[in-house]
UniProtKB/Swiss-Prot annotation:
SUPFAM superfamilies: Tetrahydrobiopterin biosynthesis enzymes-like (SSF55620). GO terms for biological process: one-carbon metabolic process; tetrahydrobiopterin biosynthetic process; tetrahydrofolate biosynthetic process. Zn(2+) binds at residues 95, 98, 166. Its EC number is 3.5.4.16. This is GTP cyclohydrolase 1. The lineage of its organism: Bacteria, Pseudomonadati, Pseudomonadota, Alphaproteobacteria, Hyphomicrobiales. PANTHER family: GTP CYCLOHYDROLASE 1, GTP CYCLOHYDROLASE I. One of its GO terms (molecular function) is zinc ion binding. It holds the Pfam family GTP_cyclohydroI. Pathway: Cofactor biosynthesis; 7,8-dihydroneopterin triphosphate biosynthesis; 7,8-dihydroneopterin triphosphate from GTP: step 1/1. It comes from Bartonella bacilliformis (strain ATCC 35685 / KC583 / Herrer 020/F12,63).
Amino acid sequence: MHSAVEKVAEDLSLSRENLSLEEVEKAIRTLLLWVGENPDREGLLETPKRIAKVYKELFSGYGESVDEILGVVFEEVAGYDEPVIVKDIFFYSHCEHHMIPIIGKAHVAYLPDKKIVGLSKIARVVDVFAHRLQTQETMTAQVANSLKKYLKPRGLAVLIEAEHMCMAMRGVQKQGAATITTSFHGYYKKDQVAQANFMTITRGIR
């Protein structure tokens, strides 16, 4: 059964399919006019088509399902009972308030309880949610909740550190400012030493 988040993604995907490429390009052409440009000049003739194509790629997460990525897990762990940590998962996203890029890295750790997953699938889960309009807080919770649902680990930790271009390019214009969000569950929620070890491994060792 799909989660509420996945159901919303499906509904949005259906809405997108009902829009023709011509309608999307027309909207982009209108935007070019609004900012004061001439969409008929040589350099902009193909711009609406290019933007439509790149947006389909940048927001591909609306057409992807975490169920398909995490639907298959492995139950043979050969007695391994220590944390699995995947760090420095680079991603780019876009803030839902200004549609300006968010660029950052995600770090994930989980303490298996008879279930493990291919390491690349953790990175793919990050990408699914990154390729949607986001707030960093929501994305952190979505990644954590998805892994928790399918792996049912004894402990789970997710840390995302990112620079928001909406803070660097406009408004206060503070380039280089990093935002850090975390989500701890189970063992990592209860054990402060485990939390500290996770923070040291993901942020303290380079």
